[in-house]
Each structure stands twice: as structure tokens, then as C-alpha cells.
């Protein structure tokens, strides 16, 4: 961000002396946004008091407020914005009783945040980077030419300070707005999944893909221009090494290099974090689908009942006679006495026993990884485990293997965004797609 020439105590004393304060409830903020929108349609960039009252009337109607006291409330709102230095009021003897109003830099900054800065544009970013590249190239050429202190201030320091640094701050602000938009998208996805996740799958996919595409476009644009920008900054830095009186230029170049590194680094980190969130949402949807298989019949039955009068149907059901237990309640029977000894092919193995065996196998694989540094290959583990069970149990066993392995750790290759190779896990065509888990 921009540097501050004042210290913290000086800034605090300055704010206290001038009695700075901002209070913008939703109706006041809406009024300010309405003023900014209407002001943008005017070439002169100024508005009369009557136009402000008309804008306030639109806001009052939207909030369903009474229209009887609209003039008084509009006057109070205008005075409040003037007091908070969001509007400037200009009066003269010629236009007495009909003042002219203009938005202050603070008012423009607030409205820009809510209106214009939220519109991400790759073309806008490309133009900003193109302007920065041109300014840096001219500054680097001027630095290599050399000259007196006035030459360095006018042709090197000034473009870097008042053009390049401000555009870097604008790009940094765009990234921070993108961070906030990601949180809003996450909230939207959470609300969709909580209401009706089946109907929300397509909407979630759209939100995920749009955000991923926007982040990728932003990062690709930064990567394409980042190397050239750093090269020109290095040219300026090399030119200042032989001069002891250019420490102010050297410090500014160092700050710009840090800003550029932070922008590019955070862009890539934001993509990696979003990829992890994308995988988390898809895993949740897959788990919900697996758990909801038994509800398919119930959902179809409800739909059939709702459309009965349009598409009548007949229901056939069987009601068998109840079996009465004629045994003595106090007589305790053993399984061996009732069923006899079961053949080996008919032995029953509980689900919990399978999970315990799986946990033991995964634990053994993990021990090998820790001792010898061998990554955990999910395809190999699943194949070895499925070989111990008949074909009819392969699906359930494979799902348990995957769930347990995912709980152990992650694969660093997942963050690259590249798909893993399909690996066969049995002799009947079943395959698994997963990177090698190498981070626990």
C-alpha cells in the first residue's frame, strides 16, 4: 500500500483535531451511491439541491419510508453527508438558496469501492500493466542515461512514485476485492447446499468454474508481465548502485519490487487455496450422493403422489401374516444350536471388522512411509486390499480405502491442478484416479 509520511501519533492527533468520523447506515449509503450514479451521468460533475432531493426520494421509496416529511429528511441527509466530508457545498450571492454539490475524494473513494472496483476486467488489468511497463521502461532508460539530481527526480523518481506505485496499489486493491468475492461465493455455495443440494449442483459448478476462471485470468496476466516489470526495476537498481546520493530512488525501487512480488505470489496462493476449496466441495457432493442413494425411491414416490391426478397409477402391496414367536421368553438359545456351524463360504464379516483391518493396513503403509520415505500410493494399497476379498465386496471396500486414505493426508500434486493418472485396482476394470499422498 501507499507509504505514510506521518507517524502514528501525528495521524491520531490530526484525526482528533479535525473530528473525523464516518457513519453510514444502509439508507445513507444507498443515498450516497444514488448520488454517485446520477453524478456519473453528468458532464459537469455537479448536482443541484433539487436533484439531490429527487435522488433521496428514490431511496425513500425503496425503503418504504413516509413521503410526508421527505423534504426535511432529505435536507438532514444532505447536511449529514456534508458534515462527514462526503459532499462539498458551494453557495454564492448569485445562486442564494440554490447551492451546488460535488462529491469529495472520500465520497468518490467509498462509492468506487461499492460500484466500479467490484467489476473485474482482464482488459482493464492488461491496460494497467501495459501503462506500468511503458513507464518502467522510460524510467529505466532515463536511469541508464544518468544525469543530475533534477534529472533523477523528474524522469525516474516521479514516474515510479506517482504512476507505477499507484497502479500497483490499484492491482493490490483488485486482489483484495477478489478475496472478498471468494468469501461471498463460498457463502452462496453453502446456502445452496443447505437448501437443496441436488438442485444446487449445477449452480455450485457454475460459481466454482467462474471464480476459478477469473483467478486464472488474473494470474496469467500478471505472470505474463511480471518478468518484464522486474527486469526494468533491476535496470534502475543497477544504475543507482554507483551513486550514493540516490538512496531515495533505491528505496522506492525496493518497495516496488516487494509490491510486485507480493502481488504475483498472492495471486498464485489464492489459486492454490481455491483449488483446495473446489476439491472440498466436490468431495462433499460425492459423499452426499453416496449417502443419499436410499432416498431416491422415496423422492420418486413423493413425485408420483404429487402428479397422481395428472398421471393416475395403481399400487399393489403384499401383507403377509405375522409370525408369532411361540418360544419361552426365558429360554436362551445359542447361534450354534439354532443354525449349526456355517461353511467357510457363508461366514459373515461385519463392516466394523473390515474397517479395523483397513485401518491396520493403512497404518502399516504409513509406518513404511515414515521409516523409508516411501509415498503412500492409493492405487497400490487399494489393489492389495481388494485382492483379499471377493468381487462382490470390491466397491464397498474400495470406498472405505479411499475415505481412510483421504483422512491421512494430502498429495502436493493436487495443488498443481493437473489430473492424476487412472490406475487399475482389480482385474475387473475398476480404476482409481488419485495422486500419491506425500504430505501427512
Swiss-Prot record:
Calcium keyword on record: yes
Molecular function terms, GO-annotated: calcium ion binding
Pfam family, one: MukF_C
Keywords: Calcium, Cell cycle, Cell division, Chromosome partition, Cytoplasm, DNA condensation
GO terms of biological process kind: cell division; chromosome condensation; chromosome segregation; DNA replication
Region described as Leucine-zipper: 208-236
Subcellular location: Cytoplasm, Nucleoid
NCBIfam families, A to Z: PRK05260.1 (NF003615)
Role according to the record: Involved in chromosome condensation, segregation and cell cycle progression. May participate in facilitating chromosome segregation by condensation DNA from both sides of a centrally located replisome during cell division. Not required for mini-F plasmid partitioning. Probably acts via its interaction with MukB and MukE. Overexpression results in anucleate cells. It has a calcium binding activity.
Subunit comment: Interacts, and probably forms a ternary complex, with MukE and MukB via its C-terminal region. The complex formation is stimulated by calcium or magnesium. It is required for an interaction between MukE and MukB.
Name this protein carries in UniProt: Chromosome partition protein MukF
Amino acid at each position: 500500500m501507499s507509504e505514510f509520511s506521518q507517524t502514528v501519533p501525528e495521524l491520531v492527533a490530526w484525526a482528533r483535531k479535525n473530528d473525523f468520523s464516518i457513519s453510514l447506515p444502509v439508507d445513507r449509503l444507498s443515498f450516497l451511491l444514488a448520488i454517485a450514479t446520477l453524478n456519473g451521468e453528468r458532464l459537469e460533475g455537479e448536482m443541484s439541491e433539487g436533484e439531490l432531493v429527487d435522488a433521496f426520494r428514490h431511496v425513500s421509496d425503496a425503503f418504504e419510508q413516509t413521503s410526508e416529511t421527505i423534504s426535511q429528511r432529505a435536507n438532514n441527509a444532505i447536511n449529514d453527508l456534508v458534515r462527514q466530508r462526503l459532499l462539498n457545498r458551494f453557495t454564492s450571492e448569485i445562486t442564494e438558496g440554490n447551492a451546488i454539490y460535488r462529491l469529495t475524494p472520500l465520497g468518490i473513494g467509498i462509492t468506487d469501492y461499492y460500484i466500479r472496483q467490484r467489476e473485474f476486467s482482464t482488459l482493464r488489468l492488461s491496460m494497467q500493466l501495459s501503462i506500468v511497463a511503458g513507464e518502467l521502461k522510460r524510467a529505466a532508460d532515463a536511469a541508464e542515461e544518468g544525469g543530475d539530481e533534477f534529472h533523477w527526480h523528474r524522469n525516474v523518481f516521479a514516474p515510479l512514485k506517482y504512476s507505477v506505485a499507484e497502479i500497483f496499489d490499484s492491482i493490490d486493491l483488485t486482489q483484495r476485492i477478489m478475496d472478498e468475492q471468494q468469501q461471498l461465493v463460498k457463502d452462496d455455495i453453502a446456502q445452496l447446499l443447505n437448501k437443496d443440494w441436488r438442485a444446487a449442483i449445477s449452480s455450485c459448478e457454475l460459481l466454482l468454474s467462474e471464480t476459478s476462471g477469473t483467478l486464472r485470468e488474473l494470474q496469467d496476466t500478471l505472470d505474463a508481465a511480471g518478468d518484464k516489470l522486474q527486469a526494468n526495476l533491476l535496470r534502475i537498481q543497477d544504475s543507482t548502485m554507483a551513486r550514493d546520493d540516490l538512496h531515495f530512488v533505491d528505496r522506492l525501487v525496493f518497495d516496488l519490487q516487494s509490491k510486485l512480488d507480493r502481488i504475483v505470489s498472492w495471486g498464485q496462493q489464492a489459486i492454490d487455496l481455491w483449488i483446495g476449496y473446489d476439491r472440498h466441495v466436490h468431495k462433499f457432493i460425492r459423499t452426499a450422493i453416496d449417502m443419499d442413494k436410499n432416498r431416491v425411491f422415496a423422492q420418486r414416490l413423493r413425485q408420483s403422489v404429487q402428479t397422481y391426478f395428472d398421471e393416475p397409477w395403481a399400487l399393489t402391496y403384499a401383507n403377509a401374516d405375522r409370525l408369532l414367536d411361540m418360544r419361552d421368553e426365558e429360554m436362551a438359545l445359542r447361534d450354534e444350536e439354532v443354525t449349526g456351524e456355517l461353511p467357510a463360504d457363508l461366514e459373515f464379516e461385519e463392516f466394523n471388522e473390515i474397517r479395523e483391518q483397513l485401518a491396520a493396513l493403512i497404518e502399516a503403509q504409513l509406518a513404511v512411509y515414515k521409516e523409508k520415505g516411501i509415498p503412500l500410493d492409493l492405487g497400490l494399497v487399494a489393489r492389495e486390499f481388494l485382492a483379499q476379498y471377493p468381487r462382490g465386496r470390491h466397491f464397498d471396500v474400495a470406498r472405505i480405502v479411499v475415505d481412510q486414505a483421504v483422512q491421512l493426508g494430502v498429495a502436493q500434486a493436487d495443488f498443481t491442478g493437473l489430473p492424476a493418472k487412472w490406475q487399475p485396482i482389480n482385474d475387473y476394470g475398476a480404476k482409481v484416479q488419485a495422486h500419491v499422498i506425500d504430505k501427512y
